[in-house]
Amino acid sequence: MASKGPSASASPENSSAGGPSGSSNGAGESGGQDSTFECNICLDTAKDAVISLCGHLFCWPCLHQWLETRPNRQVCPVCKAGISRDKVIPLYGRGSTGQQDPREKTPPRPQGQRPEPENRGGFQGFGFGDGGFQMSFGIGAFPFGIFATAFNINDGRPPPAVPGTPQYVDEQFLSRLFLFVALVIMFWLLIA
């Protein structure tokens, strides 16, 4: 009887011990599926998981790219708290093969790509500036490209004349003459 009591009491303990271990295995298996960490940037299973001091979990490659693209404003992508390479903690799980700090591994930089130059075609070699041909469309004396002409954008004209030279005096005279003509035309439009 005494031997039955301990064996009987051992049996429930074994079954209860087996139950939790069995349930923990079952929970571990189902928890294994649910216990994968998701990166808050790519929303995929975190590779080389790191956790920020504010409690958000990321893949190290994703967080590294986030920090590299914003060197002046390093904030957590989720809560905008301050974050840096030194303010994240690597996570190591059971069964992980490598115990190397993921912060020591820097993802490879993407290869640069040079786009092909565009084919200008058309008017090359005809003496139109640098090979391009420009036109300004407008109605009468009011071109639609007024900002392009006023700010000398994409223009192949020579620089203005140096003050004091005869060319400068001639340009000033022509400028005033055309201003006077423009004012006369505008006055005529107002009274007509």
From Swiss-Prot:
This is E3 ubiquitin-protein ligase RNF185. It is found in: Mitochondrion outer membrane; Endoplasmic reticulum membrane. The lineage of its organism: Eukaryota, Metazoa, Chordata, Craniata, Vertebrata. Residues 29-80 are annotated as: Required for ubiquitin ligase activity and protection against ER stress-induced cell death. SUPFAM superfamilies: RING/U-box. The keyword Transmembrane applies. Its EC number is 2.3.2.27. Residues 1-130 are cytoplasmic. Interacts with ATG5 and BNIP1. The chain crosses the membrane at residues 131-151, 172-192. Changing residue 39 to S: Decreased ubiquitin ligase activity. GO terms for molecular function: protein-containing complex binding; ubiquitin binding; ubiquitin protein ligase activity; ubiquitin-like protein conjugating enzyme binding; zinc ion binding. It is a multi-pass membrane protein. Its main location: mitochondrion.
